[in-house]
């Protein structure tokens, strides 16, 4: 079975992330969403909270699995027998950075390629960073994030 992995910090998961997961789930029989610990980023939500929010957000997708990780992505890829890495790219700046990561991951995994998904046009401007900024300044992020995330933000 072809398995792909979509790694990220997902702090929080946005509708842009969800769009990429949903599109991947149509193409591939098994999609793993790997939520990175990333303590250096000073996340708004803990790893456990982020994993749970992603799980709730993808509950309608039967071929999607969600887990947290703290290891090197290349090691996670080897452990799960991954065929490809899914990455979202919004801008040329994203693409340049992701191209470097793709080359590094291909080397470290002995050949696993990265597949780049541009966002749907309506999500091209959305990022977790922007969502956090809007939220921290009292703005409404309801249209930018899945309902479980919006509810979790309201409860904070």
Swiss-Prot record:
The keyword Glycoprotein does not apply. The record marks 17 as: Transition state stabilizer. Signal peptide: none annotated. It is found in: Cytoplasm. Its EC number is 2.7.7.3. One of its GO terms (cellular component) is cytoplasm. Substrate binds at residues 9, 41, 73, 87. ATP binds at residues 9-10, 17, 88-90, 98, 123-129. Pfam families: CTP_transf_like. Its cofactor is Mg(2+). InterPro entries: Cyt_trans-like (IPR004821), PPAT (IPR001980), Rossmann-like_a/b/a_fold (IPR014729). Keywords: ATP-binding, Coenzyme A biosynthesis, Cytoplasm, Magnesium, Nucleotide-binding, Nucleotidyltransferase, Transferase. CDD domains: PPAT. Pathway: Cofactor biosynthesis; coenzyme A biosynthesis; CoA from (R)-pantothenate: step 4/5. Homohexamer. Belongs to the bacterial CoaD family. Reversibly transfers an adenylyl group from ATP to 4'-phosphopantetheine, yielding dephospho-CoA (dPCoA) and pyrophosphate. This is Phosphopantetheine adenylyltransferase. It comes from Haemophilus influenzae (strain 86-028NP).
């Amino acid at each position: 079975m072809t398995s792909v992995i979509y790694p990220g910090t997902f702090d929080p998961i946005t509708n842009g992330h969800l769009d990429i997961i949903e599109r991947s789930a149509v193409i591939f029989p098994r999609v793993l969403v790997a939520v990175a610990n990333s303590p250096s980023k000073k996340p708004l939500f803990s790893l456990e909270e982020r994993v749970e929010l992603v799980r709730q957000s993808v509950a309608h997708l039967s071929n999607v699995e969600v887990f947290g990780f703290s290891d090197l992505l290349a090691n996670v890829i080897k452990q799960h027998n991954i065929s490809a890495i899914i990455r979202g790219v919004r801008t040329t700046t994203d693409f340049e950075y992701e191209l470097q990561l793709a080359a590094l991951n291909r080397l470290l995994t002995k050949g696993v390629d990265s597949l780049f998904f541009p966002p749907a046009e309506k999500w091209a401007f959305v990022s977790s960073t922007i969502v956090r900024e809007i939220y921290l300044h009292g703005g409404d992020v309801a249209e930018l994030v899945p309902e479980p995330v919006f509810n979790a933000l309201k409860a904070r």
